[in-house]
Structures are given as C-alpha cells and as structure tokens.
Amino acid sequence: MGDSESFVGKNWNGLKDFWSDRLSFFENYTRFTKRDAPLPSWSSSDVEEFIASDPVHGPTLKTAREAVTFGVTGAALGAVSTAAFAWKYSRSPHGAALSFLGGGVFGWTFGQEVANHTLQLYKLDTMAAQVKFMEWWERKSQ
C-alpha cells in the first residue's frame, strides 16, 4: 500500500509513446494548423491549378476529390433512407433524427469504402498529395 500511483500514472510514458506512434500522421499537418497566421482560403480554381501544375501529386489529389462525391452520396442516401424507415415504423421525431445522423455517418463511411475500391485509393498516397498541395498553397500565398 506504499505505492498509491494509479495504473495510468505508472504507465503514462508507455501509453503516450504507443498513441503517438499510431497517431503520428497528424504531424504531417501541424505546420499548417499551428501557424501564427492561418493560410488564406483557396478556391476550386486554385486546386485545379495545382492539379494541372503537379504531374505526380495532381492526379492523386484529383482522384481524392472525386472520392468525396461517393461519400456525400452515401451520406445522403444513408441519412434519408434510415430516417424514413424510422419515421415510417415509429413516428418518433427524435428516433428519426438519430436515425438520420446514424445513417449519414454509416452512409459516408460506406461511400468512402466504395470510393476506396472503385477509384483504387488504397494504391495512392492521398495524404502526401494533400500535404504537397498545402505546401504549394503556402508558397503561392506568400
């Protein structure tokens, strides 16, 4: 009973190292998110300009942008269909609202998985393309 330190307290460094290894991809964006002055907003024409100017990362970014359409479509279909089903059988507004939210999340996830296989995103490094775009935008906006 002399050592009253908790399990988490004893193993804090190990847990911190474990999770920092698994979440290390967040460090790719740190220099863009933790700035003194934020980057200015960009438009679709800026993204199209980057896609045209970078032969390596441009097509990857274009494919990643196309994948968003799958996610949005899946979210809309999932949200509306589950909310309609819940409303039809329960007539409960809060149940329909929760079904709408849950169906939207499920639909987005399912849509992204469809995009992953259809557009073969698993073969591309979309994060590197996004980081290259952010670097390009940072240089261009200075």
UniProtKB/Swiss-Prot annotation:
Top-rank taxon: Eukaryota
GO biological process, one term: tricarboxylic acid cycle
Membrane topology of this protein: Peripheral membrane protein
Keywords, sorted A to Z: Acetylation, Membrane, Mitochondrion, Mitochondrion inner membrane, Tricarboxylic acid cycle
Localisation per UniProt entry: Mitochondrion inner membrane
Sites bearing N-acetylglycine, chain numbering: G2
An example molecular function term from Gene Ontology annotations: protein-membrane adaptor activity
UniProt entry tagged with the keyword Acetylation: yes
Subunit text: Component of complex II composed of eight subunits in plants: four classical SDH subunits SDH1, SDH2, SDH3 and SDH4 (a flavoprotein (FP), an iron-sulfur protein (IP), and a cytochrome b composed of a large and a small subunit.), as well as four subunits unknown in mitochondria from bacteria and heterotrophic eukaryotes.
Protein name listed in UniProt: Succinate dehydrogenase subunit 6, mitochondrial
